[in-house]
Design a protein with these regions (language model features):
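A conserved beta-strand element that flanks and buttresses the S-adenosyl-L-methionine
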Residues: 62
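Short catalytic micro-motifs in class I SAM-dependent methyltransferases
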Residues: 65-66
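A short glycine-rich, Lys/Arg-flanked "PGG" loop and its adjoining helix->strand segment in the class I
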Residues: 76-88
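Class I SAM-dependent methyltransferase SAM/SAH-binding core
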Residues: 3, 8-51
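Conserved Class I S-adenosyl-L-methionine
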Residues: 136-199
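Short alpha-helix
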Residues: 117-131
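Conserved class I S-adenosyl-L-methionine
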Residues: 93-119
């Protein structure tokens, strides 16, 4: 059984389900119901802490680019509940953006917000290390090749959390900066840091 916390459109667990055809459909939870959520998974619009209190058991719990939404206390609470929700030899995988030399294309204000968020992630990694103790780290590099038009649309839709609190005016100004700064095809390497814990 697989649980994906902060699943968004559920692209990852949907791809896993397509490839491995698990007996139990993976469950994806998120506080936002995305209109494009994949159909081959079970989606629930619910917060992680509330859901994990049900104490169902899982073989794999994914926590993807979600830790920055938690306070330090709530992150500890989340990790404790996640550990309790694992079957024997179950795994927790925590994915987060690489905090050093991040290559995500940004306009000035977006970069400033992102750096602030990544700094906070560094402090949260220490909490994760202290709580889970026996962990291993891996970096996953994704080569991204995206049209400027599509990337601008993603910014408009506030695809990354560092854009969420910006005003429409700031987004508009940022988009014009992106339009003049980048070529029609934007290429970069997106690096995700993965923290792995086994029960």
């Amino acid at each position: 059984k697989i649980l994906d916390i902060g699943c968004g459109r559920a692209n990852i667990i949907s791809a896993l389900q397509k490839k491995y055809k698990f007996r139990n459909k993976p469950i994806g939870i998120d506080i936002v119901a995305n209109k494009d959520v994949k159909k081959n998974i079970i989606f629930k619009k619910i917060g992680a802490l509330q859901y994990l209190k049900k104490q169902e058991k899982y073989d794999l719990i994914l926590i993807k680019q979600t830790i920055h939404f938690f306070t330090k206390t709530k992150l500890n609470h989340l990790l404790n509940l996640a550990k309790k929700s694992l079957n024997n030899k179950g795994k927790i995988l925590i994915f987060s953006l690489k905090t050093k030399n991040n290559k995500i294309p940004c306009f000035k204000k977006m970069r400033k917000n992102l750096e602030k968020s990544l700094k906070r992630d560094e402090a949260l990694f220490k909490i994760i290390k202290k709580n889970l103790k026996e962990i291993s780290y891996t970096n996953f590099n994704f080569k991204v090749n995206i049209s400027k038009q599509k990337y601008v649309r993603m910014i408009r839709e506030r695809y990354i959390s560092c854009l969420l609190n910006m005003s429409n005016e700031e987004i508009k100004f940022g988009i014009s900066e992106i339009k003049s700064k980048y070529k029609n095809q934007i290429k970069f390497t997106d690096t995700l840091k993965c923290i792995s814990y086994r029960k």
